[in-house]
């Protein structure tokens, strides 16, 4: 089966004040690692930094460091100290935040997953009650794309995050559970925000590498989650 977390208050986050980011990063550095990609938010929506966009974070939902903790800042400080490049993993799919999906002001869904083949198997998302997609977006009470973009700005626009305030890569995991609500992602908007802070547009030497950003992707997945890749991994291209 599938399990990506739930919407209950975070009661399993038992990180103590003994968390030692410095030893973690130092050990990785000594082992030969050149970059540390930090999962700042996974599919469950819990944020390991002090986010202004939600209370479902390390400062609002846990007692870590008296409710004033910021794990991403701790790791960033250590990466800066040991000059370890950083990548940011920020899951687009979010099962916790109410802005995910399309709902009106009363919380009623504006999109439904329907059976268009009359075979008893739902196969397509479509607007309810004959609405157009444009009307769905107009009636959507909360804009998830803005929520996600605001969190990108919170992190990428704050010099306390990253190695010396900089991230080399942003990882957008494309996973989405079978029961996930329908949500279109504004990759263009997110791409512009990322490069504004971490790319050539932000006076960096190179553009930030992106994974899982559809047409804007620059980092290819090796095809498994086992950590193994062939010595030569070719990517097809239509010439």
Regions found by a protein language model. Give the residues of each.
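Mature catalytic domains of secreted/periplasmic carbohydrate-active enzymes
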Residues: 1-239
């Amino acid at each position: 089966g599938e399990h990506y977390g739930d919407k209950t208050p975070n009661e399993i986050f038992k990180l103590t004040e003994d968390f030692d980011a410095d030893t973690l990063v130092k050990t990785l550095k000594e082992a030969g690692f050149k970059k540390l990609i930090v999962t700042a938010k996974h599919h469950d929506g819990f944020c390991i930094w002090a986010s202004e966009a939600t209370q479902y974070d390390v400062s609002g939902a846990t007692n870590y460091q008296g409710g004033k903790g910021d794990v991403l800042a701790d790791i960033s400080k250590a990466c800066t100290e040991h000059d370890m490049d950083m990548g940011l993993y920020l899951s687009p799919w979010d099962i916790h935040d109410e802005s995910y999906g399309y709902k009106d002001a009363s919380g009623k869904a504006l999109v439904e997953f329907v059976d268009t083949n009359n075979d008893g198997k739902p196969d397509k998302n479509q607007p309810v009650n004959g609405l157009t997609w444009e009307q769905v977006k107009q009636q959507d009470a909360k804009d998830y794309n803005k929520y996600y973009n605001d969190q990108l700005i919170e992190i990428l626009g704050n010099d306390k995050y990253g190695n010396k305030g900089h991230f080399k890569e942003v990882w957008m995991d494309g996973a989405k559970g079978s029961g996930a609500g329908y949500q279109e992602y504004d990759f263009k908007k997110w791409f512009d925000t990322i490069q504004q802070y971490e790319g050539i547009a932000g006076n960096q030497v190179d553009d930030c590498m992106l994974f899982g950003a559809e047409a804007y992707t620059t980092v290819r997945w090796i095809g498994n989650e086992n950590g193994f890749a062939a010595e030569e991994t070719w990517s097809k291209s239509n010439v």
